[in-house]
Amino acid sequence: MTILTHTLGFPRVGLRRELKKAQESYWAGNSTREALLAVGRELRARHWEQQKQAGIDLLPVGDFAWYDHVLTTSLLLGNVPARHQNNDGSVDIDTLFRIGRGRAPTGEPAAAAEMTKWFNTNYHYIVPEFSKGQQFRLTWTQLLEEVDEALALGHKIKPVLLGPVTYLWLGKVKGEPFDRLTLLKDILPVYQHVLAELAKRGIEWVQIDELALVLELPQAWLDAFKPAYDALAGQVKLLLTTYFEGVTPNLDTIIALPAQGLHVDLIHGKDDVAELHQRLPVDWLLSAGLINGRNVWRADLTEKYAQINALVGKRALWVASSCSLLHSPIDLSVETRLDTEVKSWFAFALQKCGELALLRDALNSGETAALEEWSAPIQARRHSRRVHNAAVEKRLAAITAQDSQRENPYEVRAEAQRARFKLPAWPTTTIGSFPQTTEIRGLRLDFKKGNLDANNYRTGIAEHIKQAIIEQERLGLDVLVHGEAERNDMVEYFGEHLDGFVFTQNGWVQSYGSRCVKPPVVIGDISRPAPITVEWAKYAQSLTDKPVKGMLTGPVTILCWSFPREDVTRETIAKQIALALRDEVADLEAAGIGIIQIDEPALREGLPLRRSDWDAYLEWGVEAFRINAAVAKDETQIHTHMCYCEFNDIMDSIVALDADVITIETSRSDMELLESFEAFDYPNEIGPGVYDIHSPNVPSVEWIEALLKKAAQRIPAQRLWVNPDCGLKTRGWPETRAALANMVKAAHNLRQAK
């Protein structure tokens, strides 16, 4: 039985972010739909060929998405919210963009669908909306068209589908409450139709992603798998695909299904390969996810070989990435500025494909010399002086309980803060960033390339900060921000100023839609050699009598949005970052900054997928935040910001953060998230986001007032703040001014209505 290689998916955006540029050009009206579609075709063809050349035997098709693969599945099923539908009932790419963004070059603008995190990653998906009695039909044939493309190019392929049970699990009911699982019988005919079309094209295997099978599901959902897959069986071979966790707890459900193979994540799961082999049906193929799709580290292939070699010849076996390579940058070979030693520790998506090919060849032949050669830099790294810092390790070991305690409880601090700031009712603020204009990006790029000296760069940044303060004072905001003109990314900026991180030139990964991020890589112990944000915060405060917030990214978010080390625990990394940023809080306070925001949007996304593992994570995650913040005096107000979150199941931990003010993203969920805070009787102040910054639509004063009144039904008005959902970095100034003016007006109206 010859072992084959495959990947579960490949990065979509292109090495130079070609997809992002084509999307944004099309949205802005600067290019045609045909030009956008052509870029997609070119990227798919290139990526298939690159994977093939790197040694992948079965290429994934259907992993490409114009915005997000869950949204693609919604269109496949004809699940289009009424507000986004075309008058004639047709579905096109602008339908997709209206659902994701709220607007597109054609069609009427409408509220974008809710967006949330894809399991415990920093990728986002558009949440499917379900209503009672909903009908489904095949309306979007993107998958079939891409299969035809790949077949025409002569590739051996494996189409990828999001499974029906997981699709329903990821969605939300809108309107009259009902059990969305009852829709399963209605979407299965569409899946049957798609599988029949694939069978007509000679497809042998289909990868069907059922990530819900790694979760602690209610019994009714587990019971739904058998009848669903009984309905889907028989047309093609189904590779039941799971990742991000192990499957052993749900293995009884899995082995009862009429599938022909199972993919397991052997990186993030705790599954025992021998047990899987023993319990799986003898005729099932096992796809072993041995290469980590979520990081940038070179794999120890000798270790991977030892892990799986015992199964060679005993059952059909494929070797694969643990999950889609969507979460990894594309190609390490173009990183020309990385230190040679550090570069030898890494592998990006194409290199991971090469790792799979090396592993396949060794397993098929029994020859392991190439694996040992590939793995040599990993052994060298364990002893590198770039990894270990004795002073950091000593400070970490000396942490005590007192280091995570503010001087006094919230009630005492709140009195001191009210006396200091004298803010009005319904105080208005923003979350931190202002539009990153072409001028700002050009300024940073010129400085980075050496075309601008430090003095001229600083003068330019200072001018943009000054303009941000002027804009906010004109608008009448109560608590200001400096706008973050000097920051390229909320995590990358801090990583650039902390020892223990390195950066790539082209290490882009998709976050959502056209948004890409370039995560820093944690290669060693973390420390702060000098203040990071103090200079610009102090300058901004000198320009106004109103309070200006200091802006920090919190330790858990920096951890979650970086590629972490694999030789120490995530807890260790988070606490090292917390200690470094604790010193930053102290320095901001000493510089006269009275309000300091520590953003933790990733706190919930870092949760383990199984609830039984949550407590340990939340304990150290909360402790890291408190270590970061607890150095602040009573009269210093600590804010935190979170987004895309469901809070009801972690409210104990949200309260335990002990932030004086929390701002959250609520507008897309129509203030639904506040139910958690109301039910828990959240004791501190809260700023529910009143408009969606991910959409270019400008909210009306009436819309914002209505949301705030709804918020005041759940949270006492004297503890409410008024703010957008998130930072304004990706928006333009015209819509930003208009939206903030309406937000301030709504707050003033509510003050006068008291």
From Swiss-Prot:
Molecular function via GO: 5-methyltetrahydropteroyltriglutamate-homocysteine S-methyltransferase activity; zinc ion binding
Superkingdom, taxonomy of origin: Bacteria
List of residues binding L-homocysteine: I431, G432, S433, E484, D599
Enzyme class: transferase
Pathway as given in its UniProt record: Amino-acid biosynthesis; L-methionine biosynthesis via de novo pathway; L-methionine from L-homocysteine (MetE route): step 1/1
Disulfide bonds: none
Keywords: Amino-acid biosynthesis, Metal-binding, Methionine biosynthesis, Methyltransferase, Repeat, Transferase, Zinc
UniProt key word Transport: no
Binding, 5-methyltetrahydropteroyltri-L-glutamate: R17, E18, L19, K20, K117, R515, C516, W561, E605
Binding site for Zn(2+): H641, C643, E665, C726
EC number(s) stated in the UniProt entry for this protein: 2.1.1.14
Cofactor(s) recorded in Swiss-Prot or TrEMBL: Zn(2+)
Biological process, per Gene Ontology: methionine biosynthetic process; methylation
Catalytic activity: 5-methyltetrahydropteroyltri-L-glutamate + L-homocysteine = tetrahydropteroyltri-L-glutamate + L-methionine
Details of cofactor binding: Binds 1 zinc ion per subunit.
One Pfam family named in its UniProt record: Meth_synt_1
Active-site residue numbers: H694
Binding site for L-methionine: I431, G432, S433, E484, D599
PANTHER family assigned: 5-METHYLTETRAHYDROPTEROYLTRIGLUTAMATE--HOMOCYSTEINE METHYLTRANSFERASE
Similarity annotation: Belongs to the vitamin-B12 independent methionine synthase family.
Function comment: Catalyzes the transfer of a methyl group from 5-methyltetrahydrofolate to homocysteine resulting in methionine formation.
Record's protein name: 5-methyltetrahydropteroyltriglutamate--homocysteine methyltransferase
Organism: Salmonella paratyphi A (strain AKU_12601)
